[in-house]
């Protein structure tokens, strides 16, 4: 029967199902790039179709969702989901990269900065704000990554981008010269914690850099459900570490389809759904077959469901 259900990720798949693709909630260690992590996952799984959903800098740790197999079609859906970061901002120092990887220089004396001042300035960064992408980033300029230009000693003008900071809370403050502000930040797509650290330091008049960062959640995924590369390597069947592809799209409304409708969708045909079983929604939704397995993504408009991404059966 056709109907609508609440979002959910579903159970962890068995090995046979997992080998068709899924999401690996990797706990990335410090000292490797996100692409280094991808290379290791490809080697361990013996699968070429592997892609991550949002870069973590080499010094950063934490949750790096990796889409495997047919789930790589859903990487972009992760980007729209909020991310939570636990980070430490060092006040009284600056860096050309915005973190500890770059050339660190002294800022202004931060010994007089108080926790209430940090909270007050941090509150100004909540909501929609503008950030200028750092030179050491994957943003492209005339076909080249900014980090490539930075490594060549070039600096180019970058346009500010609008990003969203849903919340930013100071959880600890360690006064001194330099001082350290420990924070938990929930952000939307495209927000740079390095830029937030530098901008916060500028607002306080001391300068600032990102001293430490860990991503603790990404959409419906939490760090508690993640797995390290060493743990993955030690598994008899590492494919069992994969979560269902639905994890990437669990934030979308769910439409359950009957057998005849599934056949239409698999042929790429649109399906009319009875208004009596649909909520007042429009836009993207995820589709389930009668067994509860993810069929793909569709666009719902006035009762007409148009399939846009359909997983192979």
Regions found by a protein language model. Give the residues of each.
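Accessory RNA 3′-end/elbow-binding domains used by RNA modification enzymes
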Residues: 1-25, 29-52, 56, 60, ...
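The conserved catalytic core of RNA pseudouridine synthases
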Residues: 43-47, 65, 155-195, 199-205
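Glycine/acidic-rich beta-strand-loop module
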Residues: 45, 49-79, 148
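Residue-level signal for inorganic ion chemistry
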Residues: 66, 87, 143, 196, ...
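Structural signature of FAD isoalloxazine-binding scaffolds in flavoprotein oxidoreductases
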Residues: 76-91, 156-170
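Acidic, low-complexity central loop/insert segments
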Residues: 77-131
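Short, structured loop/turn "capping" segments at alpha-beta junctions
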Residues: 128-133, 177, 194, 206-212
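Extended alpha-helical targeting/anchoring segments
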Residues: 137, 141-165
């Amino acid at each position: 029967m056709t109907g609508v259900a609440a979002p959910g990720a579903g159970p962890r798949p068995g090995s046979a199902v997992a080998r068709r693709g899924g999401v690996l909630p990797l706990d990335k260690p410090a000292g490797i790039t996100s692409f280094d992590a991808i290379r290791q996952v490809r080697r361990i799984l013996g699968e070429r179709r592997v892609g991550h959903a949002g870069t973590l800098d080499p010094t950063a740790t934490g949750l790096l969702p990796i889409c495997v197999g047919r789930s790589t079609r859903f990487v972009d859906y992760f980007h729209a989901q909020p991310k939570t970061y636990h980070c430490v901002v060092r006040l009284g120092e600056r860096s050309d990269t915005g973190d500890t990887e770059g050339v660190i220089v002294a800022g202004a004396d931060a010994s007089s900065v108080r926790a209430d001042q940090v909270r007050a300035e941090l509150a100004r960064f909540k909501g929609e704000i503008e950030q200028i992408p750092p030179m050491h980033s994957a943003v492209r300029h005339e076909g080249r990554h900014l980090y490539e230009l930075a490594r060549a000693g070039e600096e180019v003008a970058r346009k500010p981008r609008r990003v969203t900071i849903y919340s930013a809370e100071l959880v600890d403050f360690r006064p001194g010269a330099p001082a350290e502000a420990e924070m938990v930040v929930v952000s939307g797509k495209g927000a740079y914690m390095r830029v937030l650290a530098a901008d916060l330091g500028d607002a306080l008049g001391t300068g600032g850099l990102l001293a430490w960062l860990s991503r603790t959640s990404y959409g419906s995924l939490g760090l508690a459900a993640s797995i390290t590369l060493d743990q993955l390597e030690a598994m008899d069947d590492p494919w069992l570490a994969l979560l269902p592809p639905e994890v990437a799209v669990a934030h979308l409304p769910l439409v359950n389809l009957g057998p005849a409708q599934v056949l239409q969708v698999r042929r790429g045909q649109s399906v009319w759904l009875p208004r009596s079983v649909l909520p007042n929604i429009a836009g993207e939704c995820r589709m389930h077959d009668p067994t509860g397995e993810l069929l793909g993504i569709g666009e719902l408009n006035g009762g007409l469901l148009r399939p846009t991404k359909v997983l192979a059966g």
